[in-house]
């Protein structure tokens, strides 16, 4: 008997942040975007795209590179004009998750090179951190593996823009994962093939696990 999985159990929560820098002790989140996808990477709902206000003192912590980046993208002026607090942005993402995901089965966080984003979420949006599964889907892992195992896939990946805005970065990450799925992760092996692969992998590394 095939078990039917409720669609909300298969959701991915895509989040991207823009910050004033990468150091947790002195930098802050200034833009939050979130989208939900189903198991086939279809985007569900409208998502969240919010610029968070930062004080002049917080903005003064940006180095020249980040200042130039956020100025070129138009984000810096939006930060100054924003009246949205980080708590309000966190509330909006939590509401999105509550609407589209199963609270009994927290969805993984997904994105590109998301370790830093998760660190900022954990430190500055702890309620959101608790609403996410501890597992993460990092598209950059497939990028690194394709470079080593499937160079044609690696060199033909979709071009990425340089907008440095949170929502655009999320959409590009979803598109990139969809590309890897279509170009590389396309086979659905038979049970026999999967069992053979398991046996071969087990045999190859058994000596290191004794």
From Swiss-Prot:
GO cellular component, one term: cytoplasm
Family: Belongs to the oligoribonuclease family.
Residue span, Exonuclease domain: 12-177
Known function: 3'-to-5' exoribonuclease specific for small oligoribonucleotides.
An MF annotation (GO) of this entry: nucleic acid binding
Keywords carried by this UniProt record: Cytoplasm, Exonuclease, Hydrolase, Nuclease
Coiled-coil boundaries: none
Catalytic residues of the enzyme: 134
EC number of the protein: 3.1.15.-
Subcellular location: Cytoplasm
SUPFAM superfamilies per UniProt: Ribonuclease H-like (SSF53098)
Organism superkingdom: Bacteria
InterPro entries, sorted: Exonuclease_RNaseT/DNA_pol3 (IPR013520), Oligoribonuclease (IPR022894), RNaseH-like_sf (IPR012337), RNaseH_sf (IPR036397)
Primary location: cytoplasm
Protein's UniProt name: Oligoribonuclease
């Amino acid at each position: 008997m095939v078990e039917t999985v409720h669609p909300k159990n298969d959701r991915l929560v895509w989040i991207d942040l823009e910050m004033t820098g990468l150091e947790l002790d002195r930098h802050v989140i200034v833009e939050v975007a979130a989208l939900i996808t189903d198991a086939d990477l279809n985007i569900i709902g409208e998502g969240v795209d919010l610029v968070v206000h930062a004080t002049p003192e917080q903005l003064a912590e940006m180095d020249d590179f980040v200042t130039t980046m956020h100025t070129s993208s138009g984000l810096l002026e939006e930060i100054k004009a924003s009246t949205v607090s980080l708590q309000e942005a966190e509330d909006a993402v939590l509401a999105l998750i509550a609407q589209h995901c199963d609270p009994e089965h927290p969805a993984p966080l997904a994105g590109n090179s998301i370790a830093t984003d998760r660190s900022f979420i954990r430190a500055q949006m702890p309620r959101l951190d608790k609403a996410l599964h501890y597992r993460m889907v990092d598209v950059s892992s497939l990028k690194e593996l394709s470079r080593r195992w499937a160079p044609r896939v690696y060199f033909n990946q979709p071009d990425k823009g340089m907008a440095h805005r949170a929502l655009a970065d999320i959409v590009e990450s979803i598109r990139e994962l969809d590309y890897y799925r279509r170009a590389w992760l396309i086979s659905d092996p038979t049970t026999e093939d999967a069992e053979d692969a398991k046996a071969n992998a087990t045999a190859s590394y058994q000596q290191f696990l004794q």
